[in-house]
Amino acid sequence: MFTLKKIRVALIGYGRSGRNIHRKLLLQLPDKYEFVAFVEQDKERREMIERENGVQALNDYRELFGRTDIDLVINASFSFDHARISYDLLANGFDVLSEKPASGNVNDFECALKAAKEHGRQYFIFQQYRFAPAYMKMREIVASGKLGRPVQYTFNFDGFARRWDWQTVHGFSAGSLRNTGPHPMDWALDVMGHPQDIDVFCAMDRAHTYGDGEDYVKMILRAPGAPVCDIEISSAFGFGGKDTYQVHGTRGCLTGTDNGLKWKYYVDEEAPEQHLTTTPLRTEDCTPIYCGEELPMHEEEWIPNAEEARTFNSKGLNYYNALYDTLTTGAPFLIKNDEILLQLKITEEAYRQNADMFK
């Protein structure tokens, strides 16, 4: 009987991401991953680790150095430590999966990339939203050509909520652009084709956060030959109606959320033939009129199945299944680090445009 190779995992950080996301996901893939070490600075959390996992928890990630029973280290430390700790791990011979944001700045991420290259290690960033079922379905629909050429994508992450934890503090590499932004930014750059010549507009504000970081972000990305991308992250809008996914196309459009998508489009062969008219439009009795036609529109929808509907879970499992293939067979991983680097450059430009907020 064929037995899958298990990836032996060390997890740094046992908080909301480490315990509630990464541990929860990997416990659902027991044939592919197993935990062999945990690292947590908080004493009470270390006791929790030992109760819940039966594994002794370490206080310092440097206690992992020299061990040969670890295939992958998941770095779910504080955001401001992601790049520094990843660099140390890579330089000491470990393959690393880091939580987002990959870094608080471009320079530190480039240092980590250099360490990975110099030491022959693999370095991944947890951008699991690329694997969200609704996002992948949206990409499939656009690729079919039914909507024509996409003119604009809009990605909305809106809600109405106050926040007062450490992830509201700008100096902790936090705020909405770094906390939430990596997900819609990853989508936007993906649909744009990751152009290097990209124009960035970004407006930020503080609505009711208790820290000095932003909790409102409006970002517009443009590049030659690419669709416009409109990203909105707001903690100040509590009404529905602003779907997560929107596509404006030359022959149709799409809208929806993780709970379902709907799209409509017309087929060229079914559309009434029209020609440009430069004289004023009128009826036979000379009454002025607007353009008007009966344009047959086809409407379709997609509803996720039971597993796809558990989006928070399914996109993470999709990510870890793809990562497993990369680690065990050498299959190319979908998300490349030069894509993450581009995202960080745009993030730096966004903060530069709003520097007065953080003086």
Regions found by a protein language model. Name each.
Residues 1-53:
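N-terminal Rossmann-like dinucleotide-binding module
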Residues 179, 185-270, 317-332, 347-349:
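Contiguous beta-strand/loop segments that form the cofactor/metal-binding neighborhood of enzyme cores
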Residues 55-115, 315-318:
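Beta-loop-alpha module in the N-terminal Rossmann-like domain of NAD(P)-dependent dehydrogenases
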Residues 59, 75, 98, 123-125, ...:
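Hydrophobic residues in well-ordered beta-strands that form the structural core
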Residues 111-128, 149-153:
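Rossmann-fold dehydrogenase core element
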Residues 1-4, 11, 72-74, 294, ...:
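C-terminal helix-rich "cap/oligomerization" subdomain common to oxidoreductases
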Residues 267-307:
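Charged, glycine/proline-rich intrinsically disordered loops and linkers
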Residues 129-210:
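Predominantly a Rossmann-like dinucleotide-binding segment in NAD(P)-dependent oxidoreductases
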